[in-house]
Amino acid sequence: MNSNQNRLLQSSVFPLFFLLIIWAVFYFDVTYKLNLHQYGLMPLSARGLIGIFTMPLLHGDLGHIASNSLPLLVLGICLFYFYREIAFKVFFISYISCGVLVWLFAQRDIHNSVHIGASGLIYALAGFLVVSGIIRKHKALFGISLLVIFLYGTIIWGVLPSEYQKAIHYIEDGKNISWEGHLFGFLTGVCLAYVYRKIGIQQPVYSWDINNDDDVDESNPYWLEGTEEENKPKDDTQQDAFKNTSDNPYTVNYTFIPKKDVE
């Protein structure tokens, strides 16, 4: 097993473990009819505060959990493979922040509906991977951004209010989704991409990209500098010799010879 395969295996451990927890919760809920969705997140409700921690673990039916499983696994592996230094921070901050924002700002309807599902976390991971790859300007990370857009680009419509999603036929009539969870999850991911932009893989810096203008001594511009010999200080011997020749100048005598004498 080479280093890349080993790294991929290590990056898959936590996403698979988290996915196993979600499926275990769903299995016990369905098998023993525990009605766990009552512990989902209810906005601006003391009883619904527990949903900040339980919302991503709870799902309404098999279709709901199945639709969330694959993107959660793929995005989670990408996060831990390419951003291993900050992967746990991004994951758990997204987990908690999404729930807190939904609890604070999501609308509470007359039916006291609860928010459940890991889709908010999925939107956070997608937002982080897309934006982080763009602002870091690293080829591999930018490629991951394009891959996420290609695979899950259409989920951007999920941040719109439900009535707009129904109008464009993104969701079926009579189906309700936690679009606030999608929106706040995506915004959380974008913010984390900016906050952690200096940590982890960075764009390579080449020698020709380095600006050395700060090293120039503007008090002595290079265009006013003389040659090395011109700037070299004269020693005392040279200065004394020059002084002596100035005090006692040489005499040069010229002799004129007529042209006829030359012939």
What role is predicted for each listed range?
Residues 8-90, 103-115, 168-173, 177:
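N-terminal TM1-TM2 helical hairpin plus the immediately adjacent luminal interfacial "cap"
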Residues 81-90, 131-144, 199-203:
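Alpha-helical transmembrane bundle and helix-membrane interface signal
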Residues 68-83, 124-134, 187-199:
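Membrane-interfacial alpha-helical segments at the cytosolic side of multi-pass membrane proteins
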Residues 1-7, 159-263:
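C-terminal transmembrane module of polytopic alpha-helical membrane proteins
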Residues 117, 123-171:
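Multi-pass alpha-helical transmembrane bundles in non-GPCR membrane proteins
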Residues 18-22, 93-94, 98, 102, ...:
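Alpha-helical transmembrane segments in multi-pass membrane proteins
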